[in-house]
């Protein structure tokens, strides 16, 4: 996590140092999971892919540490599981559903996001769902990534036992490759960066990249920006990634242009727009008052 923090600070020397300390333990403490779905299955809780994750225990109803979790269950369309009893009480959250409060960018399911043959696509999202008996609903997409109960099959929506990842070893390695690219693209491309990229691609069922595929430092970064999108989708790290790359405003402009309720037909422009100050969250008033000193703690600009 310290290595990730240094990445957010653009301190690539320190990031490479601390991420490298983790990679030095590959084979003993850490390694890439053999299959992408193993990164999320309860069968591999606390495995070598899992650097840090929230702990859960399947088969017990509850939402506290050490008990089952309901996070996975919220992604199941109830009409697909009517025979499961409690499942039918909650409808699965589709990430392009009617509620704007839960709407995610449809760009994750768009054409050209995943390379042809990338196993991660169908292991991450699913569409063409039979939400009724008449016909499949091709325009409905559900997150599949966290529906991984190999050991303890849940009998209720909140009885899932698969741990929720906070930091995966794949993330450590891709951040390390990115840090090395920022430090010295020419020196590290063939010896360190390319092997990491290809290890992740191999697991996804994709062919290896060559040094000639990356003409310069920017080409590597462009690849990693897209690769992190498909590898870590729905894991909660895309936003801080976009912030540190200074791509958040561009990404949100694209997002707001895609969602129906965010589009003004009169002006033919998105109704909503991210402001530059939104890159930082507002500081709670209670924290500001606790210090009572503007030189120590004050509100971020724009709020």
Residue ranges of model-derived segments:
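A long, glycine-enriched binding/interface module in the latter
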Residues: 189-289
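Alpha-helical junction/boundary sensor with strong preference for TPR arrays
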Residues: 26-27, 204
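Generic structural signal for short, solvent-exposed loop/turn connectors between secondary structure elements
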Residues: 10-14, 129-132, 205, 215-219
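Extended, hydrophobic/aromatic-rich amphipathic alpha-helical segments that build helical scaffolds
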Residues: 1-23, 52, 118, 163-200, ...
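Elongated scaffold/linker segments in the mid-to-C-terminal portions of large proteins
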Residues: 21, 28-182, 248-303
